[in-house]
Amino acid sequence: MAALQYLESLKNTHPELGEWYNSLADLYQKKLWHQLTLKLEQFIALAVFQAGDALIQFYHNFITDFETKINLLKLAHFAVVVSRQYSEKEAAVSYLESVIEKLRATKEPRITEPIIYIETQKALFKLEQGDQKECKKILDDGKSSLDSMTDIDPSVYANFYWVSSQYHKCRQEFSDFYKSALLYLAYTSVEDLSESFKLDLAFDLSLSALLGENIYNFGELLAHPILKSLLGTNVEWLYHILQAFNHGDLVQYQELCRVHNASLIAQPALVENEKKLLEKINILCLIEIIFSRPAEDRTIPLSIIAERTKLSIEDVEHLLMKSLSVHLIEGIIDQVNGTIYVSWAQPRVLGIPQIKALRDQLDSWVDKVHTTLLSVEAETPDLVAA
């Protein structure tokens, strides 16, 4: 058989992999497709296949012989890995389209998942070719299909959100990139990612969090293990800036900007959006003021906000109106008395320092309740006894 002859020829070319080829041949002859699939997953990850067109040849000379007999989503995984070895994007797209046609020809009930997985990779190739319109069309079609399905394999979601994030990154749509990248991580094991990949993604996520419209909650990102990739590198400053934003710490932010001025200037997006960044940290400073006050003290003098943010009263009013407009807070500004009554603030993910502050507030509340109870017991013993 041609497939076995091909394995034999590979054994002669790479005698050090003889055991692998013998194992693959044995499983193939016994038609143990599931076990063969698991072996192939390990095999194609070997270093010898990571350069040139070795995987392309392996696919066409061996895997094609039984491709529709194995799990079709696993076939899609193999096809995507193989497609990345094509030097020409157009050839890679044509190859993926041929695999999709084979999937459709099987008429299996669950072919939508593997097709979406492959189509998503096609979208990435289109994006790399500069065809944003076609990339967007493929992603929109994929999203519609995913929304109508249930029990979807995490790898399909991960691939979809990764390509979506790259589309938004290409267009400098920071908020959409941030959402897509976080969703990608939700369906991906961080331990399986390379250190360089984690560092690049952590950097991009951090920038998009700072620059994205209506992103005012950094707790979820800071709690994610991927952010630790920034520590001990030459971009660790970005992690500390995120911490400053999360705490609404204007003083720390300004100090970090001073110390890391050269690194900040090297990031054009940060330079271009300097005013927006200052507005955002001022808003977060306001949120920190609100959360740090006792629950019964909801009326805040504008002078306190002005002192913390180093803004004029007029600029504080603009800051409050911005916060109200993006629905970070609800309340009423009293210009006559120079105060704002805050009736609601958007919930947020709390860090350890914020949780400790909340604990202190709860302890204070418990003490007040206990004092009140003692007072009631002392003044109305008969009522309490009853």
From Swiss-Prot:
Entry keyword annotation includes Protein transport: no
GO cellular component, one term: proteasome complex
Key words, A-Z: Acetylation, Proteasome
Pfam family membership, one: PCI
UniProt xrefs under InterPro entries: PCI_dom (IPR000717), PSD13_N (IPR054179), PSMD13 (IPR035298), WH_DNA-bd_sf (IPR036390)
Post-translational modification N-acetylalanine, affected residues: A2
Tissues and organs where the protein is expressed, per its UniProt entry: Ubiquitous with highest expression in flowers.
Domain called PCI: residue spans: 173-347
Protein family per UniProt: Belongs to the proteasome subunit S11 family.
Protein task: Acts as a regulatory subunit of the 26S proteasome which is involved in the ATP-dependent degradation of ubiquitinated proteins.
Assembly behavior: Component of the 19S regulatory particle (RP/PA700) lid subcomplex of the 26S proteasome. The 26S proteasome is composed of a core protease (CP), known as the 20S proteasome, capped at one or both ends by the 19S regulatory particle (RP/PA700). The RP/PA700 complex is composed of at least 17 different subunits in two subcomplexes, the base and the lid, which form the portions proximal and distal to the 20S proteolytic core, respectively.
PANTHER family: 26S PROTEASOME NON-ATPASE REGULATORY SUBUNIT 13
Protein name from the UniProt record: 26S proteasome non-ATPase regulatory subunit 13 homolog A
Organism: Arabidopsis thaliana (Mouse-ear cress)
